[in-house]
Swiss-Prot record:
Enzyme class: lyase
Keyword Metal-binding in annotation: yes
Keywords: Amino-acid biosynthesis, Aromatic amino acid biosynthesis, Cobalt, Cytoplasm, Lyase, Metal-binding, NAD, Nucleotide-binding, Zinc
Gene Ontology molecular function: any one: nucleotide binding
The protein's annotated pathway: Metabolic intermediate biosynthesis; chorismate biosynthesis; chorismate from D-erythrose 4-phosphate and phosphoenolpyruvate: step 2/7
The protein's Enzyme Commission number: 4.2.3.4
Entry keyword annotation includes Lyase: yes
The protein's role, per its UniProt record: Catalyzes the conversion of 3-deoxy-D-arabino-heptulosonate 7-phosphate (DAHP) to dehydroquinate (DHQ).
Protein name: 3-dehydroquinate synthase
Names of required cofactors: Co(2+); Zn(2+); NAD(+)
Positions that bind Zn(2+): E183, H246, H263
Amino acid sequence: MKQIQVDLGVRSYPIYIGQNLMSDGETLSRYLLKKRILIVTNETVAPLYLKQIQETMASFGEVESVILPDGEQFKDLAHLDTIFTALLQQNYGRDSVLVALGGGVIGDMTGFAAACYQRGIDFIQIPTTLLSQVDSSVGGKTAVNHPLGKNMIGAFYQPQIVLIDTLCLHTLPAREFAAGMAEVIKYGIMWDADFFQWLEDNVTALKTLDAQALIYAISRCCEIKADVVSQDETEQGVRALLNLGHTFGHAIEAEMGYGNWLHGEAVSAGTVLAAQTAKALGLIDESIVCRIIELLQAFDLPVSAPESMDFDSFIQHMRRDKKVLGGQIRLVLPTAIGRADVFSQVTESTLEQVIRCA
């Protein structure tokens, strides 16, 4: 079992990565003793893992569950209220703990519910998708979507522990696994050139779910995320680099309707647009764009935006992006494999050129 620490002073917490961790009551015990436990999951994950995690936790306290519909389109205030209603109807107090058992949607919603309920209760992340294991479960970003923008209503709120059981990936649909790989590849592009090269060399091992390859890839992503979050918890500086591909990607998700494109698929296409923007600005050359495209394609990811999206469709959503400052769109762009920076002087005419030529 691999352990990584997110260093945030009194709010520090461990990430555990390994196989069959959902049956490891010893690791969870210190976070659950004498607490009332509410597991939040969805209709897809519940038949697979809810009974297992309930049995693991039953010896530590009273365990209940709430099961939500599955999909990004349900990550909204109405379904957040379902969690609050369950907590209130069953008289959960501040000594309770919420457990997020699922992917990024469940993790984001459960974390936000924990941040809000009685002004803050403990929560635990047990991510079951690759995307949530390498990205959304770590760092304390919690939110729900609004019809006008993704993750617009939320809070920074850290979990007590992140428990990553890589065996969950064996029940993950291939499309969901590929979507998670978009975030894995992102880390190589924006932070670690050696890791990017390792990914290029280990496509087959990852696609066949080789145990050691998965643990290494997930661990490296979590190490990078933990390092970045420890430096910049609330995204005032270096943490913004983790948004590589996300400004374009969020525009795709919002325009196409949440759930029609998976988040990772939108990030993949958005990462290519970011690379093409960097090339248009002279920051990188065509060979780097090609390496990025080829690695994304190796994992069966989209490398272009939907044909139905034009420049006007993109720009109206990008102007609402959370990174906009002083009315200026700020983009994370690669400056090399393994490096990226934030740019706020990218003109809309440059963006129009890139989007029209993509």
